[in-house]
Amino acid sequence: MNPVRKKRLIIVLAILVGVGAAVGLALSALQQNINLFYTPTQIANGEAPTDTRIRAGGLVEKGSLQRSADSLNVRFVVTDGAKEVTIAYHGILPDLFREGQGIVALGKLGGDGVLVADEVLAKHDENYMPPEVTKALKDSGQLKHYENGKAAGETSYNQEGK
């Protein structure tokens, strides 16, 4: 092999190694930013990975909110109408967080089935429900009980007085 050809081969190989490393780093960064959504039913059935950051959503079960007296630790139960998952969170909950309302929690699922959340997102207003929560409720057949953000048996007064 002559010196010119050898030099070209080395340059081409160096470029290929550089491009391969860049693609590998980009894929690694993208994979770490992916937060897959799981319903309480999927989590209870063991479909959600442990020790991986996930999103879990549903409705906060009434009477399940437990606040620590001496810290910002909070525990509550989220349901999709079929199954439930307990969520532990350390921090200040959003102002719109209420029992019976839709939320999405981001965190890691522990081996005991409790989602340790580092972020809790509450729905925007009375009429909004996250698309993932709406789909989970529809799949479990519970959506009709929570139409327009109302739990079954609750009355809601909108601007028209209905």
Curated annotation (Swiss-Prot):
SUPFAM superfamilies: Heme chaperone CcmE
The UniProt record lists the keyword Cell division: no
Record bears the keyword Transcription: no
GO molecular function: heme binding; metal ion binding
Region (Disordered): 139-162
Ranges of biased composition (kind: Basic and acidic residues): 139-148
Gene3D superfamilies linked: Nucleic acid-binding proteins
Protein's GO biological process: cytochrome complex assembly
Cytoplasmic topological domain residue ranges: 1-8
GO CC, one annotated term: plasma membrane
InterPro entries (UniProt xref): CcmE, CcmE-like_sf, NA-bd_OB-fold
Function: Heme chaperone required for the biogenesis of c-type cytochromes. Transiently binds heme delivered by CcmC and transfers the heme to apo-cytochromes in a process facilitated by CcmF and CcmH.
Protein name: Cytochrome c-type biogenesis protein CcmE
Species of origin: Pseudomonas paraeruginosa (strain DSM 24068 / PA7) (Pseudomonas aeruginosa (strain PA7))
